Amino acid sequence: VGSEMCIRDSPKDIVKKLADIGGFGGFLPTNYGGSEIDFTSYGLMMQELERGDSSIRVLSSVQSLVMNTIYSLGSDDQKQKYLPKLASGELIGSFGMSEPNHGSDPSSMKSHYSEEKDCYIVNGSKMWIGHAPICDVAVIWAKSKSNKYAGFIVERSTEGFSTAKIEKKWSFRA
């Protein structure tokens, strides 16, 4: 079992199964793909996933974190575009806060953004970002020159967006 767990690249093979049981954003409204379960039920679901394989629980938690961020802070168009696909597992999300040398301390964040004519330019590096190598979309955090923080939904196909492939990562299986 140990050698199989080490060579498995990612848990993508079980994404559909997690989606089918409401493992992604289950507390969100049904019109966005959620199942409107309460937070206690969601917590119990995470506890059971954790009992089997912590990395699978992380997949569900990170996906739900991305979904909750879009649900709480995104526009109606962004919610309609991303949430149902994240809930169904069609898209895998990643949450980009942590940075080299600073971890997840927003006050030390070096990633920055600027507003151009019709878009934002985001520059910086992130580190320790769960599921970044397999994500289709990421919520990336950065700050402006005036220290105004913002989250950006970045699709994998966006020019300049890249992630490193992590091979044979034991992570939570160690």
Model-predicted regions and their roles:
Residues 92-114:
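A gly/ser-rich beta-alpha-beta helix-loop segment of oxidoreductase catalytic cores
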Residues 119, 123-164:
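A short core secondary-structure module
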Residues 20-92, 130-137:
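Internal helix-loop-helix
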Residues 10-21:
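N-terminal glycine-rich anion-binding loops that anchor highly charged ligand groups
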Residues 108-110, 157-174:
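Flexible, small-/acidic-enriched active-site or ligand-binding loops
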Residues 1-7:
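Short, small-residue-biased leader/transition segments that mark boundaries at the very start
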Residues 86, 101-104, 128-131, 143, ...:
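Short Gly/Pro-enriched turn/cap motifs at secondary-structure boundaries
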